[in-house]
A protein has these predicted regions:
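Intrinsic disorder/low-complexity segments enriched in polar/small residues
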Residues: 2, 12, 29, 160-163
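ABC ATPase C-loop
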Residues: 6-9, 13-14
Length: 166
């Protein structure tokens, strides 16, 4: 694959779409360092599109988790990695391996298959794979619950929990 980085003077926004996919660790580190230095030197923002949560942890201040073409959770890097609310976000995080972890626990894959985006579901796109799915999840897109000015989640389960605490 050929990778091209195009930078114009006074760039306010850099969009990096899977910039480290299929790169070895050394080249990946160099690409991330370049992106970070471009950000710092030009005082620009970066939209990082990636499946690599390790890259997200190293480079991103704010994170939007998408599933089935919808943002299901958005927050600061700390809120997403340490205070995640959405079942999909929690499932993603449970799939991250820690090389320093000596436990024999197996990774827990998220069961099921992603939705057909040519025929998207009416309700929550994660419904068919969610272990907490309720009837309303299949019927309607969830509204967004705000936990802080920077942390929101779109999930009927979370709304039900929040309502029971009021």
């Amino acid at each position: 694959k050929m990778r091209i980085i195009s930078v114009c003077l006074m760039q306010l926004l850099i969009i990096a779409d899977e910039p480290t996919t299929a790169l070895d660790v050394t080249i990946q580190a160099q690409v991330l360092e370049l992106i970070n230095s471009l950000k710092e030197e030009s005082d620009s923002s970066i939209i990082m599109i990636t499946h690599d949560l390790g890259v997200v942890a190293k480079l991103c201040d704010r994170v939007a988790i998408m599933y089935g073409g919808k943002i299901v959770e958005i927050g600061t890097d700390r809120e997403i990695f340490y205070e995640s609310k959405h079942p999909y976000t929690q499932g993603l995080l449970s799939c991250i391996t820690n090389p320093e972890d000596d436990s024999d626990e197996d990774l827990q894959p998220i069961p099921g298959t992603p939705p057909d985006l040519l025929k998207p579901p009416v309700g929550c796109p994660f419904y068919a794979r969610c272990q907490h799915a309720m009837k309303i999840c299949k019927e309607q897109l969830p509204e967004t619950t705000t936990f802080s000015p920077t942390h929101q989640c779109a999930c009927w389960l979370i709304q039900a929990k929040e309502a029971s605490h009021e």
